[in-house]
């Protein structure tokens, strides 16, 4: 459906920002990368485009970087305060004379609760499987130990997330993000353990005295005991690219595990994704 996003800027902000760049991930369609000048009379920048399902978008060259979730057919108004970062920086340097913090944006629309929280709040210790830097992907672990550690960490993080007092839409976003990261950990056991070895031993190049492999189908299938990785709602969460890459770029034998259930994920092999910053 045709979706419209209108960015509203306060009068006088043209000294700080002249235009808005908006990038939209559309998964089954080509990624959009658009730019609009801010109208000097209305102080707005309007984008209209087609999306076929819930899509993530962000701005990255304005004074305020925003992360948005959008749904087809809606009009979303985003009221931007380009001075919010200046207040944050000032308060950092003058902690004894802090100004009242101000919201970066105020948005309406279907995902209003999520978009306002994601851009204005700061969750301490945001949940993550942290597949790149934790000991979760310990190179010394056997395949069975590797899977056991993943499952234990997944269950602990999901339990912690359930206890957090945050909007439901934000909780779901994190839930799907954690699941996407878990797919990455299952599907890329070879690469992640090899990377862990190089990190631990500070070895960038050269041979490694370990033979790393991906998980066999019997262990890959244990992900089914955690969640349904073919649930299309996972694409609405953070790190959706982990779900796609964890299946299509891993050389793991997912077809033996998923069969026809994985058709959507296979079809997304060439999805034109761009990095979306995680909620801070």
Language-model features, listed with the residues they occupy:
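Oxidative protein folding and maturation machinery
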Residues: 91-280
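A non-transmembrane, solvent-exposed segment enriched in polar/low-complexity residues
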Residues: 1-168
């Amino acid at each position: 459906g045709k979706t419209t996003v209108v960015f509203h800027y306060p009068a006088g902000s043209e000294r700080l920002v002249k235009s808005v760049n908006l990038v939209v991930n559309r998964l089954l369609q080509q990624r959009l990368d658009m730019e609009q000048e801010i109208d000097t009379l209305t102080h707005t920048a309007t984008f209209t485009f087609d999306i076929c399902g819930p899509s993530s978008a962000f701005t990255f060259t304005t004074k305020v970087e925003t992360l948005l979730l959008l749904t087809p057919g809606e009009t979303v108004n985003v009221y931007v305060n380009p001075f919010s970062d200046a207040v944050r920086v000032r308060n950092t340097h003058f902690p004894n004379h802090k100004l009242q913090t101000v919201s970066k944006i105020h948005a309406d629309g279907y995902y209003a609760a999520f978009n306002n929280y994601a851009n204005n709040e700061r969750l301490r210790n945001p949940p993550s499987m942290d597949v790149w830097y934790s000991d979760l992907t310990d190179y010394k672990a056997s395949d069975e130990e590797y899977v056991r550690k993943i499952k234990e960490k997944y269950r602990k993080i999901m339990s912690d997330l359930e206890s957090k007092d945050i909007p439901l839409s934000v909780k779901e976003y994190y839930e799907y993000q954690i699941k996407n990261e878990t797919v990455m950990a299952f599907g890329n056991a070879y690469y992640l353990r090899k990377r862990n070895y190089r990190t631990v031993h500070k070895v960038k190049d050269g041979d490694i005295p370990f033979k790393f492999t991906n998980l066999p189908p019997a262990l890959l299938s244990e992900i089914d005991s955690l969640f349904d990785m073919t649930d299309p709602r996972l694409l609405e969460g953070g790190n959706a690219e982990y779900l796609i890459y964890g299946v299509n770029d891993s050389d793991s034998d997912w077809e033996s595990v998923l069969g026809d259930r994985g058709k959507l994920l296979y079809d997304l092999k060439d999805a034109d994704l761009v990095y979306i910053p995680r909620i801070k």
